[in-house]
Amino acid sequence: MLRKQPGFTAVAVITLALAIGANTAIFSVVYPVLLRPLPFRDSNLLVTVGESRTKIGCCAYAASYPDYLDWKSSAKSFQSVAGYAGDAWTITGNGDPKTVFAAMVTTNFFSTLGVTPMLGRDFMPGEDLPEGSGPTVAMLTYSFWHSDFGSNPDIIGRVVRLDGVPVTIVGILPRDFELTPAGILPIWVPLHLNPFERAARGSHWLSVIGRLAPGATLQQARVEMAAINERLAQQYPRDNANVHVSVGPLRQQVAGDVRPLLLILFVAVGLGLLIACANVANLMLSRSLERRREFAIRTALGASQLHLVVQLLIESLLLSLLGAMLGLIAASIGIWLLERSLSDAQLAFMPYLNDVRLSLPVIGFVGGVTILTAILFGLWPGLSISNMPISDILKDESRGGTSRSQNRLRNALVIAEIAISVVLLVAGGLMLQSVRAVLRLNPGFEPEHLLTFLITLPAGPYPLAKDWPFENPNALRFMHEFIDRLGAVPGVVGASGTSGLPVSQNLQGDRFVVEGRAVAPGQEESVTTRRVDSAYFSTMKIPVMRGRGFTRADNATGVPVALVNQAWVKHYFPDGKDAIGARIRFTVAAQEPYREIVGVVGDVAEDNLAAPSPPTVYVPVDQQSGYATNFNFVIRTSGDPVAILPSVRAAANAIDPELAFVQAQSMDDFMNRSPAIFLRRYPFYLIGSFAVLALVLATIGLYGLISYSVSQRTREIGIRMALGAQRENILRLTIREGIVDAVTGVVVGLILSLVLTRLMASMLYGVKAHDWLTFLVVPLLLLSIAVIASYIPARRATEVDPMIALRNE
């Protein structure tokens, strides 16, 4: 029967393909993030343990190394506790120099996770001893081994150089190994610390993972860690008095901030599937009504009602299977487009997107959706027809009409389509306003014509001093020479560098005190800190509001100085007193000097565009040259910033040919790919697409309903007109039928929207979840479209010739 009506079949299959494809694409992301078991032994026993401070400033979900050692020796709720931290390294000895992000781990890290190398061996106790200039062994991830070493099975024992230090590859990690909170880290080495780092209890940088002991629960671990934390606060009030310890499932860290986003998208595509089912159900109902004489005859010849329902369900299943096959193709295209649109930086932020594919669980999901879809849109029409007595079928056939129950079912399906369309359009409208609000924000600097990239200087030729203040004169010398050379590159207007880029969600914090203000040990507040060179503010076009900026005279031999932003002044000098001349001191080391505040600069979106600028302190990198080892350079150009990249590379390689650039891109691209914009723009694109599709389907459904109603009421319309009804009366009568359904659907949709949009509140910026403008525009838009969709068939109804209609009847 499906081949006899190719138009019906094509419309139904395409509708289902779009809906099933969207559900498949989103589920292929949801599965690796929220549902797939972590690739570790007994992953439900793995937890993250971290420290944070509740006062203003940046608070990292990380621990200090001394606290980690205390936890490891004291906590009985854990079978083992391990730590890791990320860093950037330059690898040589395998082609061109390449900067990669690597992880430094305690030697029990992989045994804690329950991971065994697929080739080679694990790290051994003692390989993380602090003696020497760095790690001597390393393990590679499967993907890095495959991409950079050609899956060479003889890789074990090979020596490469990390930051100029020879390192022996001792193992290859399993193919499915991935620690999402750490990002994409292709190289793993044992942790090596200098004496200061091992003793710095106030320095929080180590991410900690624990494996619960047999019989221990998460709550028991939390209670025990709180008790240990209280003891440490009493023993070390200067560093631990204001520290809070958090213990949570490792799975929670995997999803992070994207969990609510994925759930909302999954709900959106689910609603889209319901609309598709309602639309196809209406098509099936219309088609089954046209076949009612066939069903009546078959029933009279002995066919049971169950047999008729099964036949319609089989036809529905065939439609669903065809839709699923096309949907899989559509989902594959969608996944390919997603992969193409993501930058390496975004994949580092959300590395689980590397696992988005049509895996077996995803295929199983498609199978389940296919069967469910067939039942949803095939069962109702089948039951509606099979439950009608033969006499009613023949009577309705002779009158050309349909039963009230069938009309109510068709109306209910259209109302459901309109209601769901309202929900999706409201969600899309809120996301649109949120994206526009974020894009209109002033980041505090001018991103146009800026080129940015990271250079990591290898430890060999650029050694960091082993004692405080950990200076790196070679790194500082490179930075100055590089910036001076950039000044001679055609098209370069200015060049500078910073320890951290704005809008990067990479806040670096230090505890500090203001001179003359009594602060109890451990009660110091944390503040976002950036180390920058003297040309940073002019290059970025960040205004100096009061005082002065930095100069190259602000070096290691000069008076220690600092700049602060307006947010810092408002928080620490709320009485309006001038902050210039005040002195502050970082408390990370007793030897840290007081720094005089010499200027106040404008606020910059350091965290993300949608977050208020945090109180920030800027320190000249010339006075803390250790931070020049990993430095983000920013170059302002007179034209396209990416066009000068070859000349910029040449300037760097003229100084050191073994340096590599990381994440070289324009600042505009960097900001557009930042989580603040990306995690709002993509949901808007997706939800907006679903909303438009839902609107089209609902419009088609309403148009089809009124058209079918007109065709079934030809005799009634003819009688009305024969009795004197004017064409305007017929027009209003027919349009009113569509408007009643539309209004009902809009009201139901608005009620649902009021409830469901609360789930989106955390994703919105600059707009409330119950924004009155959105809740006004969407109903007006839908009602306007409903009038148009109803007018066309209603207009056709007014052209009925009463005599011809009565004669045909």
Language-model-detected regions and their locations in the chain:
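Membrane-proximal juxtamembrane linkers immediately C-terminal to transmembrane helices
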Residues: 26-51, 75-77, 116, 181-184, ...
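Alpha-helical transmembrane segments
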Residues: 18-47, 334-345, 420-449, 707, ...
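Short, strongly hydrophobic transmembrane alpha-helices
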Residues: 5-33, 275-277, 320-325, 410-434, ...
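Interfacial "coupling" helices/loops that link adjacent transmembrane helices in transporter permeases
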Residues: 276-320, 700-742, 746, 759, ...
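Mid-to-C-terminal secondary-structure elements
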Residues: 88-89, 101-127, 135-263, 336-341, ...
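Membrane-helix entry/capping segments
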Residues: 1-11, 40-41, 96-99, 130-131, ...
